Amino acid sequence: MGSVDTSVPSFDRAWSIKYEDLDFISEIGSGGFGKVFKGEYLGAPVAIKKIHILPDDPNRVDLEKFLNREIETIKLFTHPNVIQFVGISENNGILFIVTELIEGGDLQYYLKNQSIDLPWFLRANIALDVSLAMSYLHSKSIVHRDLKSTNLLVDKNWKIKVCDFGFARIVEEDNNKSMTICGTDNWMSPEMITGLDYDERSDIFSFGIVLLEIISRVKPAPYMRDASFGLAEDIVRNQLIPTDCPESLIDLTFNCCSVDPNNRPSFKEISQTLKQIKTTLDSNIVYPEIRDFEQQQKISTTNGNNKQNGGAPKINNLPLQYSNNNNNIYDDDDDDDDDDDDNDSFPRPYSDNSNSNVTLESNSNYNSSTINGQEQQEQQEQQQQQQVKEERDEGEIEQDDDNIEVYDSDYQKKLEEHQKELLERQNQNQEGSTDENEVYEQEEEEEEEDEEEQVISTPAKKRISFGQDTFHTYEAYRTDDEDDDDDEEDEEEGDEYDHGYDDFDEDDEDDEEYDEDEDDEDERQIQYYQQQLQYQQQLQKQQEQEYQRQQQLQLQREEEEYQRQLQQQQQQQQQQQQQQQQHQQQYDDDDDDDDEEEEEYDDVIRHDTDSEEESKDKTPLPWDQHFEKQKESENKVEQEETNVVVANSQETEQQQQQQQQPKEEEEEEPTKVEDVKVETEEQTKEEHDVKVDEESTKVDEPVDEPTKVEESVEQVKAEEPNKVEELVEEVKVEEEPTNVEEVKAEEPVEEVKVEEPVEEVKAEEPVEEVKAEEPVEEVKTEEPVEEVKVEEPVEEVKVEEPVEEVEAEESVQEPVEEVKVDEPTKVEEPTKVEEPIEEVKVEEPTKVEESIEEVKVEEPTKVEEPVEEIKPEEPTKVEESVEDVKVEDVKVEEVKAEEPTKAEESVEDVKVEEPIKVEEPVKVEEPVKVEEPVKVEEPIKVEEPIKVEEPIKVEEPIKVEEPIKVEEPVKVEVASPVVQEQPPQQEEKPEVVSTSTITIASSPQQSSNSPPSTPVKQPQQQEIEVNSTPIKQQQQQQQTPTQQTQTPTKQHTEINVQPTPTKTPPLPPQTNEKIPLISPNNKSNRGCCSCFIQ
């Protein structure tokens, strides 16, 4: 037979803790021996259990024994599901057990709180943690003997910790069944209740009751048991277990609660079963929140007064908690019902059992002799009662208002119950003690009779009766009738318990005093609760008033904000209306202006389109008829232009005249020469060369295309610079010189000016040199200028369909063969002078090519042959070829001798028939030499503008030149660059001249695209006369060289470069003499057109 070691362990150094190292923070619960505090040990959070036993306590021996077991047992545990022991501390005879802190509280709180959702997976996991902890304890031969939900703590991760090992004891194999009755009745096994021997399997039955509590979330009660103290299956299955509970959990519960211990599974088997059950449940759950400790207050342990006075420091300002929630984390008893007060896990009252031999060390204050006698016991009881009263009074007096809890309707119910109990007690006290004594004597007699009938095996066993009259849940409160029944049962059980274990009787006087004290205490509690209710009601009223006031203020703010927003919106609307009115006014004004401009523009376009349609529909007429029609068209154009342009051009003319006065004085001589022919071709060539040099220098700086500028000059000369200049001046009045693309078709003059070379070189200066301004005034409305503008097909490339087919590169490579001279004739068609175009064959470019060949290489003869094959159909192609020729001229001088012929053809198309007067292009060649485009591949740079070849797009401004209608020179596409007298002197010069004339013929926008030659003010003052002659005459002129220049015989026009236009009769086509242009004043005296010479 083994024995159980019940001696209190000595305070080892490993487990002893200095009291000064402990810091008390707040009270978190109470237990069988005292209170539990939250504190810190050397900065680590811990739970501190205060054990306070009076030296005169009659239950001192059992209490010491209970404490000794818990300390000895808990020291042995190291398991994640068992609470960890930290150490023991002593101060003035009071022990403090220090363990790890579990802040979640006991499991019973979560089970009885129905508002907390506990999924089945979580419930199974809780049961598994408990089974693992108990399996560990049983492996150490330890029986817990008090397993219940209040001894299961929940940490922050929902890990379960088993605690409260006061009843645990180590069981030896030899004597593992003879143990005393202990634990809590509702979780107690049948063998323990009946007083039979039991072992660790008793914990398995208690675990089954805990599992039933987890499943049903109902507190265990006697009605759940049957006659054999097992589970009543019908009641449990039909009333307690939810319908969605897994059947495996139900089966496991009944197996654990089997009446026969041999049929109960071990905790190892239970753990395996629970693991399998978890696999069948949904693990995707949300864990409930863990409750926090209630109000906490730091308590200083370094205060010397506390140590001197002795005992643990008293905690002040702790709230007096009275609610339906049990916040005692380490609570060893269940205080919810009165029937648990005497049956919870607390050491049994003192008995005369001699086996209690527990003693403390000699240095401990617990060492005392046994106390005998009724008087000493009474004194001890009185001392305990006084101490309890003092603690309660201090807790009530020092109650802090800030820590008052808010009580709900449950609190009011509880208050009413206390009031009823108080009244009942008072009534009972008034009846007198005589009745009570009689009742007490009768009860004793009945109990003695019962004892005689029953055979008691051991004096330590007690009788327990289970009643199934009440049904308890955590949320429901007990009724008055139930409380009365419970009180009666408690009294009966208490009597039986006392007769079984105690041999002493309490005096009636002490009972009366104790009852009076309790009554006073209850009255104080009731008063206190009433005060708290009143205080809370006042607070609620104040809160409601404050809320109403805030609501009113909020409404006022919203109204003010709404009004402010309305005002802002109104202001914005007013501003928008004002802005709309202003915009409407401006829009109306702009519409009026636009309408006027559109009317003017429509008039011009209408006239142009009419004239163009007529030119297309009609077949070529004889020269006389054509001349008469030309006069009529000129008169019409003059009238229209004067009405549209003169009004706007007066102011600009005045400004330009003021600026050009000094220049005109310098250039008076060329103005005088206007009516005089060129004295000699050599002189004109020299003058032209000098002027071209100036232009080239000027053009080189602002524009990379001096050659184009020269071509534009030659083209303007070929088109009778007098008319061109006049148109330029008129257009200046309307708009300042800008890019030809920007100029509208209404203002062709502007487009002519806008040519980039004109802007950069200041086309005004060349106008001054040529002083064509006066003739401009005379020839303001010349049809050829307008026709140049009218060349809408050039812009759209509709007129010149072959333009699309022929690419610029092809024209460059084989300008003569690919580019047909007929193209410029087509260009003349949009310019309204299609007849001369048809009559005039583009043999002039052939001659130009010959001249180029003579100047550079004799290959131009070859070029003439493709010229003969060329048919003048598409001036646009010629223009493209001109642009291409420019590029090639810049690149190769010798091979591009033919290219300048194309360039000349393009010049003819562009109305730049200046090359007819070979002298000027020859002169132009000199500035080209200055630029050294031939020698130095600078003209290659010029090629970039040629590549730009935007002038094709610029043909739009050519359309703008419709009022000018300078198509006459366009019609007579003179190979002006070809007719150059200097090619024999400088063979390379004419080539350069051709290239230069091509570049100068128009800005990078007009060089190729404007076959009707846009008028541009150029430094050269020579005039260009376009002589329309039959193709045969032009061929003859080409065949007869004049001063090493090939005059175009086949060409329809001859360009006589003269400083100023002079009134002279037309010269024969084969003569080398220059024919001056006829001024508009002498048109009526002539029998031929001002542009063509017989």
Curated annotation (Swiss-Prot):
Region (Disordered) residue spans: 301-884, 946-1083
Q: Which reaction does it catalyse?
A: L-seryl-[protein] + ATP = O-phospho-L-seryl-[protein] + ADP + H(+); L-threonyl-[protein] + ATP = O-phospho-L-threonyl-[protein] + ADP + H(+)
SMART domains annotated for this entry? S_TKc
Query: Mind telling me which GO cellular component terms the entry cites?
Result: cytoplasm
Q: Which GO terms describe its biological process?
A: signal transduction
Q: Name one GO molecular function term.
A: ATP binding
> In which residue ranges is the amino acid composition biased (Acidic residues)?
330-344, 393-408, 433-454, 480-496, 503-523, 587-602, 802-816
Alphabetized UniProt keyword annotations: ATP-binding, Kinase, Nucleotide-binding, Repeat, Serine/threonine-protein kinase, Transferase
Spell out the catalytic residues. Answer: D146 (proton acceptor)
Q: Where is the composition biased (Polar residues)?
A: 351-373, 1016-1031
In what ranges is there compositional bias, type Low complexity? 374-387, 526-542, 564-585, 650-661, 972-985, 992-1011, 1032-1050
InterPro entries tied to this protein: Actin_reg-Ser/Thr_kinase, Kinase-like_dom_sf, Prot_kinase_dom, Protein_kinase_ATP_BS, Ser-Thr/Tyr_kinase_cat_dom, Ser/Thr_kinase_AS
* EC main group: transferase
Name the segments for region: 40 X 9 AA approximate repeats of V-K-V-E-E-P-V-E-E. 676-978
Q: Which residues bind ATP?
A: I28, G29, S30, G31, G32, F33, G34, K35, V36, K49
Q: Where is the composition biased (Basic and acidic residues)?
A: 410-424, 603-639, 670-801, 817-884, 946-971
**What EC identifiers does the entry list?**
2.7.11.1
The Protein kinase domain covers 22-281
Which family is annotated? Belongs to the protein kinase superfamily. TKL Ser/Thr protein kinase family.
Q: What is this protein called?
A: Probable serine/threonine-protein kinase kinX
